[in-house]
Amino acid sequence: MVDAGGRCAAEGWRRMEAPPEGADLVPLDRYDAARAKIAANLQWICAKAYGLDNIPEDLRDPFYIDQYEQEHIKPPVIKLLLSSELYCRVCSLILKGDQVATLQGHQSVIQALSRKGIYVMESDDTPVTDADLSQAPIKMSGHMAMVDALMMAYTVEMISIEKVVASVKRFSTFSASKELPYDLEDAMVFWINKVNLKMREITEKEVKLKQQPLESPAHQKVRYRREHLSARQSPYFPLLEDLMRDGSDGAALLAVVHYYCPEQMKLDDICLKEVPSMADSLYNIRLLREFSNEHLNKCFYLTLEDMLYAPLVLKPNVMVFIAELFWWFENVKPDFVQPRDIQELKDAKTVLQQKSSRPPVPISNATKRSFLGSPAAMSPADQPPSTQPLAEGSHRYHLHSEEPECLGKGASTFSPSHPLLPLRQKQQKVSQTEEIPDQRHRSNSLTRVDGQPRGAIGAWPDKKNRPVSQPTSFALHHAASCDVDPSSGDSVSLARSISKDSLASNIIHLTPQNQPHPSAGKSNGKSLLSNVNIEDEDEELVAIIRTDVSPPSPQMPRTSPQAPGLVASIRSPQRQADTLESKPDSFYLEPLMPAVLRPAKEKQITTKEDERGEGRPRTIMAKRPSEGSQPMVRKKVSGGHGSRDLNRTFTPIPCSEFAASIDLAEVGPQSAEATGEGQPLALGRFDTLPQGQAADGFFLHVGRAEEDEGRWYVGSQSPSSHDSEPWTILRQDSDSDVVDVEDTEQDFIGEDHPVVIPRYAGEEESAKLQEDMKVKEHEDKDDASGRSSPCLSTTSQLSSMSMASGSVKMTSFAERKLQRLNSCETKSSTSSSQKTTPDASESCPAPLTTWRQKREQSPGRHSKDPASLLASELVQLHMQLEEKRRAIEAQKKKMEALSARQRLKLGKAAFLHVVKKGKADGAPQPLRPEHFTKEFTQHNGEDLDDGTCKTEGFLVKEEQRDLSDAQDVAFVQLHKPRDPAALHDGEKHRMISTALLEDSVGEVDVNECDLSIEKLNETISTLQQAILKISQQQEQLLMKSPTVPTPGTKNNCQDQKIKAPVHFVEPLSPTGVPGHRKPPRLGQGRNSRSGRPAELKVPKDRQQGCSRSKTPTPSVETLPQSRSLPPSTHPRSPSDPGGELPEKCLFDSYRLHDESNHRTFVLSSCKDANIVSEQVNFKEGLDTSVKEAGLSSSTITGKEHTPVEEPLRSKASLIEVDLSDLKAPDEDGEVVGHESSVELGGDSDQKPGVGFFFKDEQKAEDELAKKRAAFLLKQQRKAEEARARKQQLEAEVELKRDEARRKAEEDRLRKEEEKARRELIKQEYLRRKQQQALEEQGLGKPKSKPKKPRPKSVHREESYSDSGTKCSSTHNLSQTHSGSSLSLASAATTEPESVYSGGTPSHRVESLEALPILSRNPSRSTDRDWETASAASSLASVAEYTGPKLFKEPSSKSNKPIIHNAISHCCLAGKVNEPHKNSILELEKCDANHYIILFRDAGCQFRALYCYQPDTEEIYKLTGTGPKSITKKMIDKLYKYSSDRKQFNLIPAKTMSVSVDALTIHNHLWQPKRPTVPKKTQTRK
């Protein structure tokens, strides 16, 4: 159990602190899907072949870069692929038994897969052969297909449609007819969607249950509650439609993971938004990867980008991952897999069993009476445990079925057999490592200041406790449960939602002095937790102190200190039975009842003995005077029964300590049990404590819980530990509370319980930490935002711890970042300081030292006499005043910043001027502030959240540093502690940056801003002075000869580990190039404070937008640590507190992005390369980040000047080079100096850049020259490339423009020609009509036969011959039908609808004639004759009929002339077809009026001639090949002949009429060709 707990907590921390590896995400435009596919496939196959941890070194990264910077696959990898070894290994894992032996070579693997129904096919569906796979040079596509096939085989082994359906049936229903998946991908989508729907259902139930109590009218209004609920965003469980597209944000998969492993993956940790930003998706994907690495044997073989961009080529990879998830959750089912619905049932059962097995503890009559306010309340409590509703205990936050009592409903008589908080016990058993579900309560609504319990408190149950480790499960789970959850959606900075004074004071009231007088019911002498443990996350209190005073039980409804060492039943991270998530449904089995007001204790006659029950001897803690607001937890321990005052801030302890603390914890209960049968139960409210349970303690952190448990147990171990002390809750806001607690704790330990000595090793530290943490957190809170955010306050230990444990609720990404930044910073420092293992150094031992110093300074820390308590009170008072002071300062700064910001907007020129001047003087550092501020102004809407919190964090730390009087130079002062101007300058910058950051959070009146413009001017002048000084110093420095390296440098190397990790950030390019934006976070250890993964989570899109580098508080980390090291150990400036990274990475990790206006640095010293590079990079980063953190630019130069830096200086001297000459003139923005960075983010104008070269004293000057030359070459090359690219682009654009112009011209010409042609046709038509009229009048046929229209024909030929080739349909004519059917074919096949196509058909015809090749008519004149005639005939004009003389003229209603023309000039044109044509034209003798041509198909090959009778609608054959008659049903398409165009056009009609000239019949009516068919019919053009 313990392990589970430890694991859980540790996971939480890991989740929060793991450095974001994806900080430098590859932007989509630079993401190469093909390369990603190769990398992912190779990683998968190597991992499967060798096991992820045993992959040979040279295969881990399959790519290498040659000297031309081209990327290639490494030869060993290629060799392996060609040899088929990998494939055989992996395939053997899938195959069974003797089949494995046959695997030798590619072919056998291909065959083995095909036997399983999986075929190795390339993307174009060509099968991959052995030859493809053995081919050299390697044919990668074949190998990728092979790996995909193996992945599919793996997938098929792990998941199948049947398995998915069986799995889904267990927790959901579905419609077999509609929803059954049809393939594996669909099955995966089906499974994921069903789990997400189930999660929706669970969360909806929880929300309803939560709202029920809230809506109940019985709630009394006394309670102070903020209604943030509506603002909270419920988690959105997405449903997938497309596996790749919709699953790429990781949310759906994480919801599945949460469903199966609610303890390992808290719902609060997952970012479940309806429209997740890129940062949210990244965060989720990272979370998924971490979970897989930690619990699923590292089965996530993709990069963040692969998942985020989800290219289709990676579908097999994603599918194999999902299959593996399914396999783990449904087949393997390790211990941590406990699906939520099933787990809820189990939890409920466990609770019942534990209830029944709990040893009876006597409860005094008085206590029982005190609970008997109303008969209603009795019921549940009295029921035998077995009858208690199952999940009740498990789900109510109150932790026990007797909830009603808690609710204040009234008192059920608690029979000893089921103590009030049955869960407690269970939890205890389950894991001592659990955190207590601190009851969060609203400020002093719990107890009045006068100490009278409010009856209303009973109404509180709606505030369910939530394991700290999971602060608020996603606010929506129980929105009510957090007043102001740090995670609540609206808190921009956690602090925001709470007003400073109210909280601090409130909670202080809860502390022992203000506690209500001893509550009426101390049943069995165990006093009730006097104030409910509060963990509001926003208004959290830190510790629960046991004091003799304990408020009446009603107050305690929610407290749960009962587990032996766990106050308030520390909930196991597994939250057995408590976690909302795990048992949502049953969470509230009983409705909340109104609280019953009980008479004040003073009015009752119950004696202490009665209250205690049977007058057992118990030590009573002296009542605390309630006069002071600083809770001093003094306890008189009478009779040697030391009351255990476990008043502690909760600090997480690293896992390494878990074991120890756990042992203690476990020992505790036993010894406690040994002590005697009845440990009194915490005031009735709390359920009797079985003897083994010490009712004290309340941790926010699992780790802490254990520590405290250990300790607490110790307390309870002593036989005399029966004493009952009420629990007091300390508000962490009062700093000294913690101090007091600890002191008292120690007092009590020292005096009465030698046993206590076994405190686990880390404990001492943690105690120290607490005080410091508290201070720090206060600072965080106040400083950060000028408001007290209880979250950040010491209490934030509570929330922060809880957050730290990985369950920060993410309502909005920014909040999460913020919370993590602040709370985790504190947490990490705490936990790290406790670490005793060597790696702990990573975490930040340095601060530890500081804390230790601080702790030693704090008088009461170790002293065991009351005097120390007094001192602690003073400290507390001091802290409170300090808080107020800070708040005021923050407000002031905010105003100044606002004005500064406006000023910056207006007076950019002034700043630039200063900057340039500074640069000329050789101190470019100061330039950054403007850059940074400007960026802020531009992007203030975007990154503000982060920025604010980071800056706040920095300020906090800075003040903390001031408070603790560290001897080292402050970060800001690093440059030159003695230089007041610089310091002042630094301060100003800090103010400006803070203000800028905060400004976005809350706007201040513009008028007020004007007031502070003067200050800004002052700042500017100070800045100028500072710049001058710095430049002078720099010059001096350069002139000085470097000193010999001192041993300090050596220390430095060792100290690197200790120093706080520094956050290196390269200044962003003004254009916001995403690639340059990565905060490398070189030194960031897991616990480093400044670098929470939060930054990482900054949405990439935002990152691109704002060029501000995001280093939350580079200095923050460094400060305490640097303080703790003596100056000699600082070869580097504290600002550069050596990263923990191995030296080798430092150099590489910092590519200088010359293109993006960063400074360029070349490091020449190799011995110190990593140190120098850190500095250099840091310098780059600092320019921005320092400003961001609110430091003066002088800090940067500090590196060169600080005495501490002496060793470093000795190694390398600084040479400044102007880079402007290194850069090709037209290379825009490639090496841009700081000025440009000062300008707007998007401004990429070229500015001269300054490069720093560190010159190693021992190296020859020529080495420097070489490097410079190389650098110049590189620059030049880049410039040329850029030039070439630019030229190429311009050429392309020009070409496109020409093309467009040419097309427009053609269109214009075509239109003009068309117009002219139409005019000609019209004229011709009018002329013919006139002739026809004349003819009808008997004037005789005009003599103008075919010759007249010739000009038209000629004209057309001329005008179109040039454009014919351009005509759109010319290509249609290339249909190669033999014979003369060309124009027919063209019309019918490719543009059958040409009827509607406007003018194009005519073009087509013209172009036909214009292209002799296409026009098969041997003589042009015939064409022209025909054309004239056809025009006439189409008008039914007999006058123009030019058929052979032997025919009689057709009547005007006949289409005979048209058919005649069609056959002679189109269907059967040419000499070849002449005999056939003539035989058909003999039909002229036929009497029929209307003829129809039958075509074979859309190609318009002539087949037969038919006669059509319009009256009877009969169509019968005259000659040719085809059916004897054609009915309506047989007709497929209808055509009309256009005489002037000599082509048939498709008619969109379906019914026959006299306007139809040709038709086709359905294809199936044609029989295969018979040899008898004359070939002539085939020869169509």
From Swiss-Prot:
Where is composition skewed (Polar residues) in this entry? 1104-1132, 1361-1372
Q: Which residues form a coiled coil?
A: 869-905, 1005-1037, 1265-1336
Q: Which residues carry this modification: Phosphoserine?
A: 216, 370, 374, 415, 550, 553, 560, 572, 586, 626, 718, 724, 734, 736, 1069, 1133, 1378, 1407
* Compositional bias segments (type: Basic and acidic residues): 603-617, 765-785, 853-865, 1092-1103, 1225-1237
Residue positions where Phosphothreonine is found in the record: T511
Q: Which SMART domains match?
A: CAMSAP_CKK
* Region Disordered: start-end pairs: 351-399, 424-470, 603-649, 765-803, 821-866, 1064-1143, 1225-1251, 1288-1315, 1332-1428
Region Sufficient for interaction with SPTBN1, as annotated, extends over 867-888
Where is this gene product found? Cytoplasm, Cytoskeleton
Which part of the chain is the CKK domain? 1443-1576
For this UniProt record, give its keywords in alphabetical order, as a comma-separated list: Coiled coil, Cytoplasm, Cytoskeleton, Microtubule, Phosphoprotein
Biased-composition ranges for Low complexity? Answer: 792-803, 826-837, 1373-1390
Q: Name one Pfam family in it.
A: CAMSAP_CH
What's an example GO BP annotation here? regulation of cell morphogenesis
Region annotation Sufficient for interaction with calmodulin: where it falls in the sequence: 899-918
Q: Which domain of life is it from?
A: Eukaryota
Matching InterPro entries: CAMSAP, CAMSAP-like_CH_dom, CAMSAP_CC1, CH_dom, CH_dom_sf, CKK_dom_sf, CKK_domain, PRC_barrel-like_sf
Q: Taking every annotated instance into account, which residue ranges of this chain make up the domain Calponin-homology (CH)?
A: 215-330
**Cellular component, GO annotation:** cytoplasm; microtubule
Q: Write out the tissue specificity statement of the associated record.
A: Expressed in the central nervous system.
Per UniProt, what is one GO molecular function of this protein?
Answer: calmodulin binding
Q: What is its main location?
A: cytoplasm
By sequence similarity, the record places it as follows:
Belongs to the CAMSAP1 family.
Domain observations: The CKK domain binds microtubules.
Its subunit composition reads: Interacts with spectrin via SPTBN1; the interaction is direct. Interacts with calmodulin; calcium-dependent it prevents interaction with spectrin.
Supply the name of the protein: Calmodulin-regulated spectrin-associated protein 1
Organism field = Mus musculus (Mouse)
